[in-house]
Amino acid sequence: MTIPIVLVAPKIPSNTGNIIRLCANSGAQLHLVRPLGFELDDKKLRPAGLDYHEYAHLQVHDDWAMTKQALQAAGCDIITALTTKLSKPFYDYDFSGQTTDQSDNQSTTSPSSNHVALVFGSETAGLPDDIRADIGADNWLRLPMLADSRSLNLSNSVAICLYEVWRQQGFDGDEGRSIGYETLTVYDPK
């Protein structure tokens, strides 16, 4: 199961580089929505992602409408927005796709209910109001933070959320091993 991650107008290349690496290591698909605050060949983007760019599934869209269309075409049943606005806590959301049959109390997987996209706004402005409205307040989620905190780093937020969704879905695709550093290419900034 591929988990779509959507970054709307990301500004900081190193954050996106980290998220590219995260997506490559988890099998998630990354969707970037223009305008971007950098070029995809930006030198600041590359070091954070090391040589993972070739392993990541990346799509760039001109606007939210095109992104939403691509998500729906890929079978996304639920689109969630991560926001600092009033919303339900991320940990209260069930991403597992498990439903319980009340007659025999058995848990089963519902294939139509576990394909969820996680949408994040830019580091500086968050998600635009129109995109949050389009997603709908029932699907607004927030990560817990202390009362005086403004926000978490974008790449940290994506990592927390992606791994929780993947955990709830049984870490589908994980083989319990890593290829190790011996196969990585060292970044050469020249």
Region roles according to the model:
Residues P4, A28-Q29, I78:
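Residues at the starts of beta-strands that form the adenosine-phosphate
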Residues D134-Y187:
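Structured adenosyl-cofactor binding patch, chiefly the S-adenosyl-L-methionine
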Residues S26, A48, D134-G136:
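Short, structured coil segments at secondary-structure junctions
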Residues V8-A9, R34, A56, L141-A147:
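Short beta->alpha connector loops at strand-helix junctions that form conserved
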Residues Q29-P35:
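Short internal beta-strands
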Residues S14-G27:
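Histidine-anchored nucleotide/phosphate-binding helix
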Residues I3-N15:
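Short, glycine-rich nucleotide/cofactor-binding loops
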